[in-house]
Amino acid sequence: NDTHSHFDETALPLRLALLDGACDIRLHCGGFPRLASFIKQARQRAISEQMPLFLLDAGDSFQGTLYFSCFKGQANAALLNQLGIDAMVVGNHELDTGNAPLANFLRQIRFPLLAANWDLSAEAEDKPTRMQDHPLMVSWQNPAHPKPYIVKWVDDVPVAIFGLVLENMQDIAAPDGDSQFLPVVETAKTIIEQIHADGIEHIILLSHLGFPRDCQLAQEVDGISLIVGGHTHTLQGDFGALGLADEHPYGERFNRTLVLHAGYNSLMVGLAEVSLLPEGQMRIEQGGNVLLTSETALLQSQQGEPLPAPQQRTIRRFLRNQRHVAMLQPDSAMERLLANNYRAKLRHYASDQVVSLPRGLRHVRIPDERGGSQVAPLVAEAMLFQAREMGVPVDVAIFNAGGARISLPPGPVSAAELAGRLLPFASTISHFEVRGGQLRLALEGAIVNALELGGSGSFPYPADLRYSYHASAPRGQRVRQLHVKDRTGRWQLFDEQRDYRLITTSYTAMGKEGYHALLNQRSEPELLGLIISDAFINYARSRGILTPPQDALYQLNFDQLVS
């Protein structure tokens, strides 16, 4: 689940609990060649023991790296086909840029795409990216696939598998306007009744709702044997010896329902051997999540320096003895597919040095005791820069913190790092006029969403705009002391009655995650004509050296929270 186009290995920071003390390292892990190798071994074992094997993907294959930015899902389809996926549920990032990329993906895959609570019946008959009539689209009332589930067999026992997607998809992604997402609980109950009426007791839910919601759903809805889920990047199992968060035990049971999640970014994979019990129940006989690496995987210090040979031998011996680590040779067929069809086309990004950093730039979503993001305000500045370079007279910019994904280390930074890791989402940029009072309310809504409603990615980082936030003030009056920087570089008082031309991501412009006041636009949003990573690369290249922003653009005051 949540592989996010991480087809190549990742340098993962670990803190190993060695006998002589903790050891901080970076280990190259994961990637689809290792994933393919693990799956091939699991299939061979299943065949030898005469057991079926179901390979399920819990969504969010899209976005995350240059592989998606450049190939728009084509590489995802080819690599998932190569793995031999049995079914995949639709994740929210599959719909970040509308239905079209997923519709094209659907035409290339050889496995069913599950989304039982996605109603596509309003699609026009002549819509070029219509999915409603596709036989692999297992959605709500699709005439090409009348039942909203698929059936697999364990010997002579049928097992039904259906998928559920986030019912608030319109709020956190950008599906087409003809898409409707039905309530999760009611849909689940309806489908389970239908499955039982068809004489099937054992039911697997392939979910992209997130771990807390999966656990809640298991307690609210009877009849689900097993949930395989994604969305929250939850890693079940005890990975404490590797310094990874020990979040939840593997295969927790809620109301007779087992719940399985397997991390993120193709770093891990879960394998569970499950017995079918009477009355639709299942029991895990053995299994768990494992971190994928190799005997010869690159080992470095946290600073990226080589480790002495004796220390490397000690660490590799330690890793071999960890039951949650799989040491695998990458699969040669998957490696060839990547190398010959996709990796070579991305090579120029890695060799294109865009900018240099005298010091690292830290990124956090919500400001903490060390301050806020040093990256996100620069992205906001980049949108202003790019618009003004193109002759668009914008006044202020806002960038939501969740759009940036990593901190930047000191030294030279490549286009691959910026477009593939820092700003991996192919977000377009919009500009439009909005009344000052609505802009102030949008800032407040985004901050409330970040601080009180769990949506940390919405926190607003501005450019040429500054504000203070007072948590103890009544709703609607929390954002104060706003100023706007004019073209001479002087700060001017913010005017609530004036129209300002705002530039932001198209995602934010749609009023997502607390920014709903931006929907009260005074002019139609216009696209700038390029994506956020391109704007940032152009901005960074023009500066040559990036340093943290000098202006204090926001102040947070927490006397007490008032809801």
Residue ranges with predicted function:
Residues 1-293, 375-382, 397-399, 433, ...:
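Acidic, metal/ion-coordinating pockets
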Residues 24-28, 127-142, 238-252, 296-336, ...:
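Surface-exposed intrinsically disordered loops and tails
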Residues 37, 41-44, 104, 190, ...:
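Charged/polar, solvent-exposed surface patches and flexible loops
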Residues 272-409, 510-512, 540-563:
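A short C-terminal boundary segment appended to hydrolase-like catalytic domains
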